[in-house]
Amino acid sequence: MVKLKETIQKAIPKHARVPLITVALLHSIFYWIPPLLTGGAYHRDFSIFVDESIPFLPFFIIFYAGAYLQWGFSYVYHSAISRGVCTRLAAADIITKVVAAAFFVLLPTTMVRPALDGGVFDFLVGIIYFFDEPVNLFPSLHCAVSWLCFRSAFSMRRELGGAYAWGQLAFSLLVFASTVFVKQHVFVDIIGGVILAELAWLASSHLPSEAVFGRLEAVFSRNKSNR
């Protein structure tokens, strides 16, 4: 346990811990609470003509599930490298989740999922379907968070290299495609998620996020030292 703690402390520097913990906690709150508030509400289906021509490709569950790895790696890696990017990314993420949660509650959406066959990838899709009901669709947080991974990488392209930043974009585009190919979202959800994340990223540059998280870090450090 001591070695594990030391490894985590090395991977996640002190300045990144409060922002990342805050992001993780708020994600759970803003994603899981809205369905409890809208259980009996009318849910709209935002499917359009484009969605009718999009096939069900269960193989893309690899990229859909891979998004979770992208988020975890990118948020920790980018935050560890730059305090400024860390706090801006956290602020953009929080803005995204707050606005998305408002949509989930005020404009609940749903969609029709396909019947699954017995293949391996269908089985994996079925696991996602079991744990993730067809709600909280617009805007797509899957697409929004992957876009923030790219935007934060692009902001550090001089430090990380252009190839890394464009690699983030390429993987994010595969994540976008996966959301409709595995029928977790409809096309409009992608557009909404990307626009929301981009606006949140732009807005975060005008917020004193570094100072705010710095104060929170000081408060937690003070409380810890007083124990």
Sequence positions of predicted segments:
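N-terminal transmembrane-helix/juxtamembrane module of multi-pass inner/ER membrane proteins
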Residues: 2-71, 116, 125
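Aromatic-anchored segments of alpha-helical transmembrane domains
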Residues: 28-32, 97-103, 170-180
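Membrane-interface loops
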Residues: 36-49, 79-163, 211-227
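Hydrophobic, membrane-inserted alpha-helices
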Residues: 70-74, 147-152, 170-178
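Interfacial helix-loop-helix junctions of multi-pass membrane proteins
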Residues: 114-118, 134-138, 174-202
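Hydrophobic transmembrane alpha-helices
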Residues: 150-154, 197-205
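Short hydrophobic alpha-helices at membrane interfaces in multi-pass membrane enzymes
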Residues: 160-173
